[in-house]
């Protein structure tokens, strides 16, 4: 859709996977050892909850510099809304919306990696938790769903022929995914009073108690939802 644009932007310390392509995006060089370079990737700082305003300004400033330095060369911004390298680090709605606005202003698609976050916050999707419904172009899910899937906005759908049965999961795996998604959606797991938040609050309260007792040994943040 964005050809010949070929560059990608991601967050520092992100993890996107280990395949030949996405290992190029993962911000850890040891995962690329021995692999050929397939993508040109640039990075911006992830959200810093200790300095909200500065964090937004820095991210926007980095993006604007890249888009000025390499005009029309960026195809996508790949985002984890909650990072899982070295603990769980939770982003921020205002921060993400500012980034999405700059990307769309420069014709750069926003891809949300929900392989880790799908069905693990108080909403089905983490992008819904951060109220990014109108800002997202492509979403990837996996892990809890037992199968992987990519969801596109209408104007980002691949043309016929690009995706075939080669990439289709087995019928049993798809049935398992359907059962799990239905269970999470309809049996009290979601919402502020749902099972996922209840479990999180239980563990967070115990971790807070340990923090008070051993402040030099353990400290937050404690993640979000089932990501503790």
Residue ranges and their predicted role:
Residues 1-228:
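Conserved N-terminal phosphate-binding loop of PLP-dependent enzymes in the Aspartate aminotransferase
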């Amino acid at each position: 859709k964005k050809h010949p644009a070929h560059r990608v932007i991601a967050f520092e310390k992100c993890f996107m996977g280990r395949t030949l392509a996405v290992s190029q995006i993962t911000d850890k060089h040891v995962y690329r050892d021995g692999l050929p370079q397939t993508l040109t990737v640039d990075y911006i700082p992830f959200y810093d909850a200790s300095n909200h305003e500065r964090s937004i300004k820095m991210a926007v400033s980095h993006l604007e510099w890249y888009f000025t330095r390499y005009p029309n060369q960026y195809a996508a911004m790949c985002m984890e809304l909650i990072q899982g390298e070295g603990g769980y680090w939770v982003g921020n709605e205002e921060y993400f919306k500012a980034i999405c606005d700059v990307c769309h202003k420069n014709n750069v698609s926003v891809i949300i990696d929900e392989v880790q976050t799908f069905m693990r916050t108080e909403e089905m999707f983490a992008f819904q938790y951060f109220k990014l419904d109108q800002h997202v172009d492509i979403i990837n899910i996996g892990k809890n769903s037992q199968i992987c899937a990519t969801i596109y906005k209408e104007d980002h759908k691949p043309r016929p022929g690009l995706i075939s049965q080669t990439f289709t999961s087995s019928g049993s795996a798809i049935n398992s995914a359907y059962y799990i998604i239905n269970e999470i959606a309809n049996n009290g797991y979601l919402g502020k009073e749902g099972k996922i938040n209840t479990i999180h609050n239980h563990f967070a309260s115990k971790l807070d108690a340990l923090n008070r007792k051993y402040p030099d040994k353990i400290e937050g943040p404690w993640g979000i939802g089932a990501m503790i």
